[in-house]
Regions:
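Perimembrane helix-loop-helix junctions
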Residues: 167-172, 195-221, 228, 300-301
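Signature aromatic-anchored transmembrane alpha helix within multi-pass, membrane-resident enzymes
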Residues: 6-9, 125-129, 181, 198, ...
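Hydrophobic, aromatic-rich transmembrane alpha-helices
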Residues: 201-205, 274-319, 350-356
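Membrane-embedded, lumen/periplasm-facing catalytic core of multi-pass transferases
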Residues: 369-420, 426, 431-444, 453-454, ...
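Transmembrane-helix motifs of polytopic, lipid-linked glycan transferases
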Residues: 97-121, 159-163
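Membrane-interface alpha helices of multi-pass inner-membrane proteins
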Residues: 130-135, 159-164, 175-190, 197-204, ...
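Membrane-lumen/periplasm interface segments of specific transmembrane helices
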Residues: 15-19, 210-294, 318
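Hydrophobic/aromatic-rich transmembrane helices and adjacent perimembrane loops
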Residues: 151, 157, 309-310, 330-361
Length: 500
């Protein structure tokens, strides 16, 4: 590794530490809360289990706590964070030790982008620019690299897949096996990572790379099947995660005990068309718009490389799959998450395309253009961090302020993973079915309180507006957060009768 790359990587690590210290001071959003909640239990020897219910697909029959975790989300982010907690909790505490593990992974993202750019024929200067672009992350990924999520993990694993894939495409069996292991790891970080395995399957159909493709596909398949077998072994219907992930037509139904939404063909098509447009905007935003042109130039310049063709094919495949198969999830963060696996390699292509285009200019003009681009990305990164602060730290402080108004014991809330972290108590999801079902959930788990925030399911609007409910009465208010007490049993049947 060259000295300039080492110096740049260390500088970017410092930038991440400052980002974490000043802005990303708590998990922030549901995914991250979930990962670290379970990571703490895993680090303390309690396995992949949760003592809260963020979604009823993890407690399909209102199963007693703790329940097996990760029926929907993938486990690698939790495992990485648990490693940090096990090693550093006595010194840094749970949150900072989990975050330290993520920052350690993110520290290698610039180097991965550098190696990618060099593998495509870019000069060392252009490769350093790619490393800086990937490391800074711009408006979208600057905070993502230090959040307790899968962004940094997917970025590193996905980028190394493209680097190794080129060698596998020329018949290197060892490279094919490594690529397969990377696909397996990417799948354990993000479910759509399994689609990367199709690139290895394609190699198996070519005589020159057949052995490499078969080796990689077999390893990726073995890892994937092992995780799927774990899911099948858990109690409850295994198809529930698929049904809630793919077949819902209203996003609220994802959080219902009994999803009952229906839609005609026009609505189904409209939702997917909307997701295609929304995801395109997200992709352009992740590229900071002005990097889209050098990316296209980089694709043209590097098209002769198998990794570049695989990058283009997989990027298009995942864009279409997210919008058509998981449209409701794609437009609520899933597609943005999937872009992390592509981002550093995309920055390598941006550097390659930029170098190709700037070659026609004088040296001073090239330096000015490069410095201007990096400066703009750095400024946008700072804006991204301040936006993260406003988007996630402000609601966090409101929840902390409301905590003392919530009576002791378990309670119901719309973001159970977040409230579990904040309250250090068992928290159950407020079912989107409505207050009557919520009362039954509360009784099943011996909870006496329900918390409603400004963002709540439509079935609770009347209760939130103060119109009352036969089962809950308001007992306290903290800002826009309202706390209700359970006052009546609606005559709940058994869980098997509640859940159809």
């Amino acid at each position: 590794m060259s000295r300039p790359l080492v110096a740049l990587s260390l500088g970017l690590v410092l930038f991440r530490v400052l980002s974490a210290a000043l802005f990303v001071t708590q998990p922030g959003f549901t995914d991250a809360y979930y990962y670290v909640d379970v990571a703490a239990r895993l680090a303390h020897g309690q396995g992949l289990t949760a003592d809260f219910i963020w979604n009823f697909l993890e407690a399909p029959r209102l199963d007693p706590l703790p329940v097996p975790s990760h029926r929907f989300w993938m486990p690698l982010a939790t495992v990485v964070q648990a490693t940090g907690i096990a090693a550093l909790e006595p010194v840094l505490g749970v949150f900072r030790s989990a975050q330290a593990a993520i920052i350690a992974v993110a520290a290698f993202v610039p180097a991965a982008a550098y190696v990618s750019a060099r593998s495509l024929g870019a000069s060392s200067r252009a490769a350093l620019a790619a490393a800086a672009l990937a490391g800074l992350g711009g408006f979208t990924f600057a905070p993502a690299w230090v959040t307790l999520d899968s962004f940094a993990i997917a970025a590193l694993v996905g980028t190394m897949f493209f680097v190794v894939f080129s060698r596998a495409a020329f018949g290197d069996v060892r490279a094919g096996a490594i690529a397969g292991a990377l696909v397996g790891l990417l799948f354990l970080a993000r479910a759509e990572g399994a689609l990367f395995g199709l690139a290895l399957v394609a190699l198996a159909f070519r005589r020159s790379s057949r052995a490499a493709g078969i080796a990689g596909s077999a390893i990726a398949l073995a890892i994937g099947l092992a995780w799927l077998a774990r899911g099948l072994a858990l109690p409850g219907p295994a198809a529930i995660a698929l049904a809630k992930g793919v077949f819902i037509v209203r996003y609220e139904d994802f959080f219902a005990l009994n999803p009952n939404g229906s839609a005609d063909l026009a609505t189904l098509i409209g939702v997917r068309a909307g997701a295609l447009w929304s995801d395109l905007v997200v992709a352009l935003a992740a590229l900071l718009l002005f990097l889209a042109v050098p990316l296209v130039l980089g694709l043209r310049a590097g098209w002769r490389f198998p990794a570049v063709r695989a990058f283009a094919a997989l990027a298009l495949l995942i864009y279409v799959a997210e919008a058509l198969i998981w449209p409701l999830h794609a437009t609520r963060g899933s597609y943005f998450h999937s872009l992390a696996a592509f981002y550093p390699f995309a920055m390598a292509l941006v550097a390659l395309g930029g170098e190709t285009w700037l070659a026609r200019l004088e040296q001073n003009a090239r330096r000015l253009a490069t410095a201007g681009t990096l400066g703009a990305v750095a400024i946008l990164a700072v804006f991204g961090l301040t936006n993260w602060d406003a988007s996630f730290n402000v609601p966090y402080r409101a929840r902390v302020a409301a905590l003392e108004a919530i009576p002791p014991g378990p309670f119901l809330a719309i973001d159970a993973a977040a409230w579990r972290w904040i309250s250090d108590r068992s928290v159950l999801l407020v079912p989107s079915d409505g207050p009557e079902t919520a009362a039954c959930v509360a009784i099943a788990y011996r909870a006496q309180s329900l918390v409603l925030e400004p963002a709540h399911f439509s079935a609770y609007q009347s209760l939130y507006d103060g119109n009352g409910s036969p089962w809950f009465v308001q007992r306290a208010e903290s800002g826009a957060i309202r706390i209700y007490s359970l006052v009546r049993n609606p005559g709940c049947p058994s869980p098997d009768q509640i859940i159809r």
